[in-house]
From Swiss-Prot:
Fe cation binds at residues 54, 58, 128. It comes from Shewanella denitrificans (strain OS217 / ATCC BAA-1090 / DSM 15013). Pfam families: LuxS (PF02664). Homodimer. This is S-ribosylhomocysteine lyase. Involved in the synthesis of autoinducer 2 (AI-2) which is secreted by bacteria and is used to communicate both the cell density and the metabolic potential of the environment. The regulation of gene expression in response to changes in cell density is called quorum sensing. Catalyzes the transformation of S-ribosylhomocysteine (RHC) to homocysteine (HC) and 4,5-dihydroxy-2,3-pentadione (DPD). The lineage of its organism: Bacteria, Pseudomonadati, Pseudomonadota, Gammaproteobacteria, Alteromonadales. It catalyses: S-(5-deoxy-D-ribos-5-yl)-L-homocysteine = (S)-4,5-dihydroxypentane-2,3-dione + L-homocysteine. It comes from the Bacteria. Its EC number is 4.4.1.21. Binds 1 Fe cation per subunit. The gene is luxS.
Length: 169
């Protein structure tokens, strides 16, 4: 099985909260696509709560688009990581990590402004596969933790996993 890019970085050296360029590529027509690792928690030290990450999934994507979309950037998708330590964000364009970090910080401030569960978008059985598995208080606690900690940048050059460790497990 091919080794995915996300498994070639040393998770023991990752900082959080932090932004990392996970992948860059071009479409056949030449459009730049960038995938960002938005790491909320230090891997293997903490995870986002199930209900909190699910509620953030519903809120975060819209708020990030509000702060990041422009003439040169368009968010395609923001999805939670299976390990529940963050989100992957795919977009058209090549914004700098600090621009993404600033948008993320503003999106977390937006989460804190949501006042009631009913304000969570697509929170119904028709648009959500587990619409009862949400917690606005948990999402707000995550947002406050990110704001309080600040958002750094993880550089791939500092996280390259030694080849001798690639197949261990």
């Amino acid at each position: 099985m091919p080794l995915l890019d996300s498994f070639t970085v040393d998770h023991t050296r990752m900082q959080a909260p932090a932004v990392r360029v996970a992948k860059q590529m071009n479409t056949p027509k030449g459009d730049a696509i960038t995938v960002f690792d938005l790491r909320f928690c230090v891997p293997n030290k903490a995870i986002l709560s199930e209900r909190g990450i699910h509620t953030l999934e519903h809120l975060f994507a819209g708020f990030m688009r509000n702060h990041l979309n422009s003439e040169s950037v368009e968010v395609i998708d923001i999805s939670p990581m299976g390990c529940r330590t963050g989100f992957y964000m795919s977009l058209i364009g090549t914004p700098k990590e600090q621009e993404v970090a600033n948008a993320w910080l503003h999106a977390m401030e937006d989460v804190l402004q949501v006042t009631k569960q009913e304000d969570i978008p697509e929170l119904n059985e028709f648009q959500c596969g587990t619409f009862e598995m949400h917690s606005l208080p948990q999402a707000k606690a995550i947002a406050q933790d990110i704001i309080s900690a600040g958002i750094g940048v993880n550089q791939n050059a500092e996280l390259t996993l030694d080849e001798s460790l690639l197949s261990k497990g």
